[in-house]
């Protein structure tokens, strides 16, 4: 599951790398669900509709990158038989009933409110100067694909309470960047298996093979045999 602030291009190379390792993968495009409030309700409903239409079978494990992490329990809750497990990929952990605004420094929300226009956030790469994509993604074509896919999300989304859904099943964590040191530590404190890579937040797109290896290692630790990956 890609971040609500990005699109499938941020994960497509990782999906390909996982497929090379024998993991069946599906990437959903969640962008149409994040352009108008209430975003959480629309996101979860759209996820349920798309996965039902896809007629997916077998044990399913959800991987959430970045801002998709806190939503994984709600996505998993839409499956009639539940999800086999969750993997948080350089992502925030679930905070049921709390908003994005509740979990970040006040000055970050204030900055985003200042750069928003007509109630809409700019694309993710325009939140700050300089453009983080220039530093993180050297390949111009890939950088353009990621930039073009980034949606303009309503500022109100940041204040919406996240779905009040808990998760007590198998879970794991892959840390890619320093921004998620605390989340990885919290996951470890919960007893989850954790893998830490010397990478960056968009290594899912720029250097996917080590990320795929880390995920497969987690699957091996969490399941025998591994579940299919969604």
What are these regions (language model features)?
Residues 1-5, 65-66, 91, 176:
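Glycine-rich His-Gly loop
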Residues 62-63, 86, 173:
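Conserved alpha/beta-hydrolase fold motif
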Residues 121-165:
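Conserved alpha/beta-hydrolase catalytic His-Asp/Glu region
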């Amino acid at each position: 599951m890609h971040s609500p602030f990005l699109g499938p291009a941020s994960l497509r190379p990782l999906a390909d790398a996982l497929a090379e390792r024998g993991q069946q993968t599906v990437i959903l495009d969640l962008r149409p669900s994040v352009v108008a409030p209430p975003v959480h309700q629309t996101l979860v409903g759209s996820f349920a509709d798309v996965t039902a239409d896809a007629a997916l079978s077998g044990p399913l494990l959800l991987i959430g990158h970045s801002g998709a992490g806190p939503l994984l329990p709600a996505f998993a809750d839409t499956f009639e038989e539940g999800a086999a497990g969750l993997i948080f990929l350089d992502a925030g952990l679930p905070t049921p009933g709390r908003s994005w605004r509740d979990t970040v420094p006040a000055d970050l929300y204030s900055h985003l409110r200042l750069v928003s226009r007509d109630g809409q956030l700019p694309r993710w790469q325009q939140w700050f100067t300089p453009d983080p994509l220039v530093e993180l993604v050297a390949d111009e074509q890939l950088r353009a694909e990621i930039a073009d896919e980034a949606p303009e999300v309503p500022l109100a989304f940041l204040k919406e309470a996240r779905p009040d859904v808990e998760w007590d099943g198998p879970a794991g964590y892959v840390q890619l960047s320093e921004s998620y040191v605390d989340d990885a530590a919290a996951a470890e404190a919960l007893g989850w298996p954790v893998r830490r890579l010397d990478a960056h937040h968009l290594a899912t797109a720029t250097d996917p093979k080590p990320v795929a290896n880390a995920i497969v290692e987690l699957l091996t630790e969490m399941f025998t045999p591994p579940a299919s990956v969604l």
